[in-house]
């Protein structure tokens, strides 16, 4: 429970800081940027102290304290600036219709693909079968680790993999949070921020409802029609359809015998690849800022 309070503290610090820095932006933009900034603070600030104190509870608390100081400083320096009272300048149905279903889907996929207990066995998804082992190993091995950290499978070898997307889970583990829940919550949150940020970016860039809807659908509900090959022969053999869900590497995403590789952003990239997901959580705000929006 305390781990989720720590997460909430970083998120609140990010929201307070962005609210002070960008008072003229509407409420939805400030909320999205604030939550994104909060995750960035959670990934980076404890790391600074870990080089001296190891990646333990003290480093996490000092990181949270620094985040609070940063937020309070910005709030104090910009206390007299008027805030934009409007929540959003896009039609409210746009983020509801486009983002909410994707977030619900993502939360469900995070649940089914991350150490789901079934009859005493731990189940994962086909797309996370390999990647999750790496991320779990990094998140658990960073507890009280000296910085720069070693790769747990090769002691004495510095960890060269971008691990900040997993270190936020370590922060929560240090304060007693459940491993599975920490991965699911942070993963779903990052996916939600990517969806929301993309919709905001498209709207600010085009101010077109049709363009925003089309771009979002093409970005996240992508992959083409290759999945239709998986339905070939289903009428004659019902097990062929079941194999899509229960067989090992029988999904439509990988059919080398047909020289076909059908890839979807959500199931093949955002769900299994936490480092990419953490990067996109930062990338979308960076692009938004780059265009001066």
Q: Each predicted region: which residue ranges?
A:
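Transmembrane helix-loop junction
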Residues: 19-20, 50-51, 141, 174, ...
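Membrane-helix interface "capping/anchor" motifs
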Residues: 20-30, 204-211, 293
């Amino acid at each position: 429970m305390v781990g989720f309070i720590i997460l909430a503290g970083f998120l609140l610090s990010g929201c307070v800081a962005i609210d002070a820095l960008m008072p003229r932006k509407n409420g939805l933009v400030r909320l999205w940027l604030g939550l994104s900034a909060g995750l960035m603070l959670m990934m980076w600030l404890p790391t600074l102290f870990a080089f001296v104190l190891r990646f333990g509870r003290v480093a996490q608390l000092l990181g949270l304290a620094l985040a609070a100081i940063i937020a309070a400083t910005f709030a104090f320096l910009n206390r007299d600036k008027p805030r934009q009272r409007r929540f959003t300048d896009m039609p409210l149905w746009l983020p509801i219709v486009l983002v909410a279903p994707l977030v619900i889907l993502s939360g469900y996929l995070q649940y089914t693909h991350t150490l789901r207990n079934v009859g005493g066995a731990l189940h994962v998804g086909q797309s996370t079968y390999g990647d999750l082992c790496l991320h779990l190993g990094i998140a658990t091995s960073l507890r009280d680790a000296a910085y720069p950290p070693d790769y747990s499978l090769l002691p004495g070898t510095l960890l060269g993999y971008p691990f900040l997307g997993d270190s936020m889970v370590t922060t929560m583990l240090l304060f007693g949070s459940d491993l599975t829940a920490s991965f699911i919550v942070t993963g779903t949150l990052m996916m939600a921020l990517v969806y929301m940020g993309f919709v905001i970016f498209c709207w600010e860039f085009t101010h077109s409802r049709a363009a925003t809807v089309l771009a979002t659908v093409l970005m996240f509900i992508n992959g083409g029609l290759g999945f239709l090959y998986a339905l070939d022969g289903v009428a004659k053999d019902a097990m062929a359809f079941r194999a899509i869900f229960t067989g090992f590497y029988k999904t439509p995403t990988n059919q080398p015998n047909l020289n076909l590789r059908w890839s979807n952003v959500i199931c093949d990239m955002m769900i299994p690849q936490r480092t990419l997901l953490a990067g996109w959580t930062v990338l979308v705000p960076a692009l938004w800022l780059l265009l001066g929006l």
